[in-house]
Amino acid sequence: QDSGRVPYGYVWQGRQYEGLSCVYLEMIEGFGGEWLTPETGRVGLDQAPGIAATRWLDDLIEAGISPRAVTNFSESEALQSFKSGQAAFMRNWPYAWAELQKNDSAVNNKVGITTMVAQAGEKPAATLGSWGLSLLSGSARPESTVEAFKFLTSEDSQRYLYTNFGYTPTQNALFNDQDLLQNHPSLASIGEALSFARSRPETPLYAQARDVLQRKLSSTLTGLTSPTQGMEQAERSTEQVLE
C-alpha cells in the first residue's frame, strides 16, 4: 500500500451483520480475550483484550489501511475488492480461494493463505462456519438421510467438492493427501487455519448477544463512539440480555 501497488492494505466484513461478529471473535481471541464464556456467563467485551480488538479494527479505518466503505462490506464486497487487486490482504471464508482462481480474477495464481493475525504470545483464531448436516427427529426417511450424509462426507465426495468448487473438506485424511496437496498446496494452509477454529458463544441467547455486539461495534467503526465507550455499552447490554 505504501508503495502505491494497491489502494488499501486490508479488507474484511465490517457491515452491521453476522460477518462483523465473526471478525470480532477472531480479533478478541487473538488479543487473548473471550467474547463470552458460556460456563460462567462472563462477558469479556469491556476487558482489555475486547477494547484492544475494537481499537485495532477502528484504527485500520482511521489509518486508511481499510477503506471507510468497509463498514458496508459483507463477504461479497470484500471478495470483489480483493479480487480486482484493490487490497493486499483480505479476511474471508475458504470458498473465496476458488473464486480468486477464476479467469476474471486479477490475482489469479498470486494469492496465498495464512492464519489470522494475533498479538505476540497469543494464538490466532478462525471463526467456525455455521454450515452442517442435520437430521430432524421426525424425518420420514432417517435411514436414507444418514446414507446421504455418509456419501457427502466421504473422502471421495469431499475431494471432488474441494477440487471442483472449493468447499473445505472435514476429513483429516485429505489434508495429508499428497496427490491433493501437490495440485492444491493451499490446502495445507487451510488445514493449519482450521486447527485454530473457534465456535461463536454457545448460548440460547446468542441472537440477542450478537445483535448487541454488532450495533455497538458498528457505532464505533462509523465514528459515533470510541472503542472504550462502545465496548462498555456492549458489555453492559449483553449482561442485561443474559440476566
List the model feature ranges, each with a label:
Residues 68-83:
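Short helix-initiation/N-cap motifs at beta->coil->alpha
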Residues 9, 61, 88-92, 112:
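Paired acidic/hydrophobic, glycine-rich loop segments that form the ligand-binding mouth/hinge
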Residues 1, 39-71:
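Glycine-centered hinge/linker elements that transmit conformational signals in sensory
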Residues 55, 59-65, 77, 101-167, ...:
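Extracytoplasmic/periplasmic substrate-recognition and gating elements
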Residues 1-43, 87:
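Extracytoplasmic/periplasmic solute-binding protein
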Residues 1-15, 154-164, 240-243:
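Bilobed periplasmic-binding protein-like "clamshell/Venus-flytrap" ligand-binding domains
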Residues 111-115, 163-215, 219:
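Long, aromatic- and glycine/proline-rich binding clefts that accommodate carbohydrate-like moieties
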Residues 75, 92-97, 131, 191:
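Beta->alpha turn/N-cap motifs
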